[in-house]
């Protein structure tokens, strides 16, 4: 199943007054596996502080929040919820391509080369989906 979806807040008391809607860009679901993808486009895919490239904090907080709230929906049932920040590739020397395990969930950061024929872009997206289905193999470029 591939779709954009709303992710409910995991509220202890059920009171969600003034909380924003969590809307994923893409959610892939297959059996007990879920991959939430948030697509981003920036002139700079990383931020630089003190000559060190780091991920945009707000983006990482956002995908982590989506994943942890979706993860809580499963309760004690066997499941795997992962998240991915998917950036459009820029001409910068540093391009994010990392996977982290955070509080029991896989969070990946990838770049997508949009400077290709559509068939190559489709191949990159298919590689992401296949990697998700088969233990997260790395996705290729054009």
Identify the residue ranges that each predicted region occupies.
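Catalytic core segments in nucleotide and nucleic-acid processing enzymes
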Residues: 1-142
């Amino acid at each position: 199943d591939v779709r954009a979806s709303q992710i409910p807040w995991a509220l202890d008391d059920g009171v969600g007054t003034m909380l924003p809607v969590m809307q994923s860009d893409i959610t892939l679901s297959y059996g007990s596996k879920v991959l939430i993808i948030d697509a981003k486009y920036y002139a700079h895919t990383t931020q630089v502080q003190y000559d060190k490239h780091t991920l945009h904090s707000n983006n990482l907080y956002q995908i982590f929040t989506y994943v942890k709230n979706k993860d809580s929906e499963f309760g004690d049932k066997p499941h795997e919820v992962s998240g991915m920040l998917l950036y459009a590739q820029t001409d910068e020397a540093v391009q994010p391509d990392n996977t982290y395990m955070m509080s029991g969930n896989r969070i990946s950061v990838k770049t997508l080369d949009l400077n290709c024929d559509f068939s190559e872009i489709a191949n990159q997206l298919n590689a992401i989906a296949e990697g998700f289905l088969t233990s997260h193999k790395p996705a290729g470029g054009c």
